[in-house]
Swiss-Prot record:
InterPro entries: His_Pase_superF_clade-1 (IPR013078), His_PPase_superfam (IPR029033), PG/BPGM_mutase_AS (IPR001345), Phosphogly_mut1 (IPR005952)
SMART domains per UniProt: PGAM (SM00855)
PANTHER family attached to this UniProt entry: PHOSPHOGLYCERATE MUTASE
Keywords: Gluconeogenesis, Glycolysis, Isomerase
Catalytic residues of the enzyme: H12 (tele-phosphohistidine intermediate), E90 (proton donor/acceptor)
Organism: Mycolicibacterium paratuberculosis (strain ATCC BAA-968 / K-10) (Mycobacterium paratuberculosis)
UniProt similarity note: Belongs to the phosphoglycerate mutase family. BPG-dependent PGAM subfamily.
Region described as Disordered: 119-138
Encoding gene, per UniProt annotation: gpmA
Reported function: Catalyzes the interconversion of 2-phosphoglycerate and 3-phosphoglycerate.
Protein name: 2,3-bisphosphoglycerate-dependent phosphoglycerate mutase
């Protein structure tokens, strides 16, 4: 690589369950019309700012895959290589998957709700195998025994960072502009690593849907601008505030 490498992070556009304020995790829901528009706009922002990706990485969940496709189409980059991995999936929310966030907070209280939702190392109760929103019969996860039954953010760090180091970093070091289209918590895990955030500080990190976040990295893959730079800062601030408020109503 040269003196710097360019990495762009993009959380998927608004999903059907984002709009309903439900815990989603590994449940494979699609995008809303708003989410699709966010995805297209993110690709337009990339093109407008000349930030054209050479390689794309995403998860195995349709809300991220669809966002990636729409963004690449809008940026006229549908032809670049795309790699998908479960290691970029959203955090598994265990038995909370499919539950309304506000109702969950009312039932268990603010402290427990926030510990499950935002803490670094407190996983929700595990999901039961064979239940409606489990993934144990999903062929995508046959090689990993159906996937986890629950996760905290620390678990996402453990599964994602080796993939980032072993698979994505070589593209960055070769000079490619890399776009990662993933999820709120898988991206929080990566930002924690890039910015060397403490376990306590990452609790307050909120990543909005559908707005590209640019990181220019030095030779040690440390950010030249801590926290990166959103391509639409005003929309990003509003979106992050909306994420922070989920479950409060």
């Amino acid at each position: 690589m040269g003196e710097t490498a360019t990495l762009v992070l993009l959380r998927h556009g608004e999903s059907e369950w984002n709009s309903l304020n439900l815990f989603t995790g590994w449940v494979d829901v699609g995008l809303t019309d708003k989410g699709r528009a966010e995805a297209v706009r993110s690709g337009e922002l990339l093109a407008e700012q000349g930030l054209l990706p050479d390689a794309l990485y995403t998860s195995l969940l349709r809300r991220a895959i669809t966002t990636a496709h729409l963004a690449l189409d809008a940026a006229d980059r549908l032809w670049i290589p795309v790699r998908r991995s479960w290691r970029l999936n959203e955090r598994h929310y265990g038995a909370l998957q499919g539950l309304d966030k506000a109702e969950t907070k009312a039932r268990y209280g603010e402290e427990q709700f926030m510990a499950w939702r935002r803490s670094y190392d407190t996983p929700p109760p595990p999901i039961e195998r064979g239940s409606t929103y489990s993934q144990d019969a999903d062929p995508r996860y046959a090689d990993i025994g159906g996937g986890p039954l629950t996760e905290c953010l620390a678990d996402v760090v453990v599964r994602f960072l080796p993939y980032f180091t072993d698979v994505i970093v070589p593209d960055l070091r070769s000079g490619k502009t890399v776009l990662i289209v993933a999820h709120g918590n898988s991206l929080r895990a990566l930002v924690k690593h890039l910015d060397q955030m403490s376990d306590d500080d990452v609790v307050g990190l909120n990543i909005p849907t559908g707005i590209p976040l640019r990181y220019d990295l030095d030779a040690r893959l440390r950010p030249l601008v801590p926290g990166g730079t959103y391509l639409d800062p005003e929309a990003a601030a509003a979106g992050a505030a909306a994420v922070a408020s989920q479950g409060r109503g």
